[in-house]
Amino acid sequence: MKKILVLNGINLNMFGKRDPAHYGTATLEQIDARVAAWGAELGLQIDCFQTNHEGEMVERIHRAHEEGVDALIINAGAWTHYSYGIADALAILKAPVIEVHMSNIHAREEFRHHSVIAGLARGQICGFGVGSYHLALLAASELLNAGQE
């Protein structure tokens, strides 16, 4: 069974409480449960992780490299726009990386338009709410089933 690591970054533990116009009302726990269910339907093993500490995120990405995860889906939150440490950690991975966001970062404030992760990712999915995670899982499954990295 292919293993997918789903990473959620800074402030994303506040889903369901923070700015429902952009992020909806689902909590991170509800999102993680949906991701696990969607993964099971696709025959994928899902591991979800969230932290508000950049160093912890980098260390989890390093462990993903050591564990040999098959793909990584990341919603880095605000780190998307400035964390070169997270970007450098992602660059170490051999597995495909898919960047995901619940809101359309390109239709929001100017500072959100730039991603330091996008250039390292196979693709970026944004603007579909919780469905962005589902689309990312479908993309990961397609990549892995096609034998692409």
Swiss-Prot record:
Biological processes per GO annotation: amino acid biosynthetic process; aromatic amino acid family biosynthetic process; chorismate biosynthetic process; quinate catabolic process
Alphabetical UniProt keywords: Amino-acid biosynthesis, Aromatic amino acid biosynthesis, Lyase
Protein family (similarity comment): Belongs to the type-II 3-dehydroquinase family.
Record CDD domains: DHQase_II
Domain of life: Bacteria
Gene source species: Pelobacter propionicus (strain DSM 2379 / NBRC 103807 / OttBd1)
Signal peptide (UniProt feature, chain positions): none
Function comment: Catalyzes a trans-dehydration via an enolate intermediate.
Oligomer and partners: Homododecamer.
Name the record gives this protein: 3-dehydroquinate dehydratase
Catalytic activity: 3-dehydroquinate = 3-dehydroshikimate + H2O
Catalytic center residues: 23 (proton acceptor), 101 (proton donor)
Uppermost EC category: lyase
Site positions for Transition state stabilizer: 18
Record flagged with keyword Amino-acid biosynthesis: yes
Sites where the protein binds substrate: 75, 81, 88, 102-103, 112
Pathway this chain belongs to: Metabolic intermediate biosynthesis; chorismate biosynthesis; chorismate from D-erythrose 4-phosphate and phosphoenolpyruvate: step 3/7
